[in-house]
Amino acid sequence: MAKGRGSASWSARAIVTLMAVSVLLLQADYVQAATYTVGDSGIWTFNAVGWPKGKHFRAGDVLVFNYNPRMHNVVKVDSGSYNNCKTPTGAKPYTSGKDRITLSKGQNFFICNFPNHCESDMKIAVTAV
């Protein structure tokens, strides 16, 4: 009989532990990636450089660039290319007009490399934590 009671006691503890873990999992806040449409008007265009101000980005968040592909594009670049408005060799422009780009941890730099567009502040720098 003692053996039976020990098994029941162990089973009861296992159930209580399982229930506690379940409650914790249900209450946990799961961090999900956020999606941001670039540009105050929802369009990737000139004078976008200030758009990221006041926003908090995380690695895995997605930036959506909406634009007319006959007039603009998006190129992910490094800080030097961003500051100089130069497209590095081998950089692949996004050209769909509805590009979705996932942020990596750290600094992320984007420009339009159509002539004189980056120089007209069609560029953004985003830091993702």
UniProtKB/Swiss-Prot annotation:
Keyword Lyase included in the entry's annotation: no
Tissue specificity statement from the Swiss-Prot or TrEMBL entry: Expressed in the inflorescence and in the transmitting tract of the pistil. Detected in roots, stems, cauline leaves, cotyledons, hypocotyls, guard cells, pistils, sepals, stamen filaments and vascular bundles of roots but not of leaves. Not expressed in petals, anthers or pollen.
Disulfide bonds: C85-C118
Subcellular localization(s) per the UniProt record: Secreted, Extracellular space, Extracellular matrix
One Pfam family linked to the record: Cu_bind_like
InterPro entries registered for this protein in UniProt: Cupredoxin (IPR008972), Phytocyanin-like (IPR039391), Phytocyanin_dom (IPR003245), Plantacyanin (IPR041844)
Signal sequence interval, chain numbering: 1-33
Top-level division of the source organism's lineage: Eukaryota
Name by which UniProt lists this protein: Basic blue protein
Species of origin: Arabidopsis thaliana (Mouse-ear cress)
Taxon lineage: Eukaryota, Viridiplantae, Streptophyta, Embryophyta, Tracheophyta
